[in-house]
């Protein structure tokens, strides 16, 4: 299961929800979010965080 699908499943997490469909209007209003997203894309940190959250939320789906 890829990371984006996992984000869509974690509806309880507002941060996961934001990352799942990156609303452009939110970034235009929030330079902090925009900078944070830019940093995550550059470091790959967002993917590692998602993988960690996914393992806690759905451990059985990550065995493959």
UniProtKB/Swiss-Prot annotation:
Source species, domain of life: Bacteria
Induction of the gene: Identified when cells are grown in rich medium (at protein level).
Further comment found in the protein's record: Encoded upstream of the pykF promoter.
Protein name: Protein YnhH
Species, as recorded: Escherichia coli (strain K12)
């Amino acid at each position: 299961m890829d990371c984006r699908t996992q984000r869509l499943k974690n509806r309880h997490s507002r941060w996961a929800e934001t990352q799942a469909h990156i609303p452009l209007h939110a970034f235009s209003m929030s330079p902090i979010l925009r900078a944070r997203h830019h940093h995550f894309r550059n470091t790959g940190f967002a993917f590692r965080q998602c993988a960690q959250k996914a393992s806690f939320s759905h451990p059985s789906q990550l065995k493959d």
